[in-house]
Amino acid sequence: MKLRTRKASQQSSPIQTQRTARAKRKYSEVDDSLPSGGEKPSKNETGLLSSIKKFIKGSTPKEERENPSKRSRIERDIDNNLITSTPRTGEKPDKQLSRVRRKSPVNGEAGSYEMTNQHIKQNGKLEDNPCSGSPPRTTLLGTIFSPVFNFFSPANKNGTSGSDSPGQAVEAEEIVKQLDMEQVDEITTSTTSANGAAYSNQAVQVRPSLNNGLEEAEETVTRDIPPLTAPVTPESGYSSAHAEATYEEDWEVFDPYYFIKHVPPLTEEQLNRKPALPLKTRSTPEFSLVLDLDETLVHCSLNELEDAALTFPVLFQDVIYQVYVRLRPFFREFLERMSQMYEIILFTASKKVYADKLLNILDPKKQLVRHRLFREHCVCVQGNYIKDLNILGRDLSKTIIIDNSPQAFAYQLSNGIPIESWFMDKNDNELLKLIPFLEKLVELNEDVRPHIRDRFRLHDLLPPD
């Protein structure tokens, strides 16, 4: 039985070999005809049916290649349109764009602006790139210098201390106008009344000292002050009769001493403010001299000044401004002499970012000015910044303040020495003229207020009740 089986296996081996070879060839043909889409294998076909199947087989993978379900990370990074916040035109930059974040001028939300889309001009003025799709960036100067004063009128003289007037909202705009309209003499500083009309602060302050007659004063009025009632025609301009009729009335309403007369009293909270200065030491002089900065010791401008003594940049509201500084004649001589007998305190209504940097240049070692106070130390009364000397924590009987604006020391009029505003006069000697009187006050070693009151008689300039 076994022998017969062995013979059968030996005899069938060639036949089995042939069958295996045929099966391999047949499997190879079927494998070549398998579709890539996973369809069932079929026999080789010819004719119309074969052509249709070939067309289907060839188009299906092509659609998949055109719309792949996933892309590699490298392919996604090439498409920059997926990561840009604003559309760009033109060629793409070779290097990565630098971005800055700033508050939106409309609603205060933070937004990203590409600095490559704009060209920065001098003092923060920006020029839009015509090839950019980003929104233009707007800037506002604000008030880094001492703000101008808003005078009281009968409509708002009963305001409370610390309340803001409507004019404060357009304060920055008026400062910008002042800088743009700065003349050669540079003595025009505009203010804003409660109803938004612009008035010349400097013209009001200097007018009592003018000796050129009423015609020159009227010319100043017609140039700087718009009429309140008289209509304006292109042929006639402002009515001269109206200027004559209302000159004294305007002077009474917008007199700085009218402002002082009707300034509201300090609130309980303001009276109890914590002193901003440290206690005196043994080396501190007994008397304190408070000095204003702008138009008292220096004159600064954002417009380029050919005769500027120094210039420096200031970063304010994300914009860099170049500040040009003129020093008042005898500025350093005055400080060097007074610092030997007085505790010099600089008290300005300007922003700290500007005033502090300027003082670091003028007095880097703080040998002349011992302390510095800024706008945040002032009292805001209807948009006006007043320097209340109580914040010093010093004996007011031995404290003196020098300021070109009498309104600044409205709460301590007997401690204040007014000085003429300075802008560019190289022959000015007002600082030198004050030295003998200041030295005498120290020698007397008495209450300085009666002597200041008798010398400058500012109370006599207040309007009657």
From Swiss-Prot:
GO molecular function annotations of the record: phosphoprotein phosphatase activity; RNA polymerase II CTD heptapeptide repeat phosphatase activity
Swiss-Prot/TrEMBL GO biological process terms: negative regulation of BMP signaling pathway; positive regulation of protein export from nucleus; protein export from nucleus
E.C. code: 3.1.3.-
Domain of life, per lineage: Eukaryota
Record keywords, A-Z: Acetylation, Hydrolase, Phosphoprotein, Protein phosphatase
GO cellular component: nucleoplasm; nucleus
Alphabetical list of SMART domains matching this protein: CPDc
N6-acetyllysine modified-residue sites: K26, K57
Residue numbers carrying Phosphoserine: S28, S51, S85, S104, S134, S165
Comp. bias intervals (Polar residues): 8-20
Positions where Phosphothreonine occurs in the chain: T86
Region named Disordered: 1-133, 218-239
Gene3D superfamilies attached to this UniProt entry: HAD superfamily/HAD-like
Residue ranges, compositional bias (Basic and acidic residues): 60-79
Domain FCP1 homology: 282-441
Any Pfam family matching the protein: NIF
InterPro entries to which the protein is assigned, alphabetical: Dullard_phosphatase (IPR011948), FCP1_dom (IPR004274), HAD-like_sf (IPR036412), HAD_sf (IPR023214), TIM50 (IPR050365)
UniProt xrefs under PANTHER family: DULLARD PROTEIN PHOSPHATASE (PTHR12210)
Family of this protein: Belongs to the CTDSPL2 family.
Role this protein plays: Probable phosphatase.
UniProt name for this protein: CTD small phosphatase-like protein 2
Biological source species: Mus musculus (Mouse)
Lineage: Eukaryota, Metazoa, Chordata, Craniata, Vertebrata
Gene field: Ctdspl2
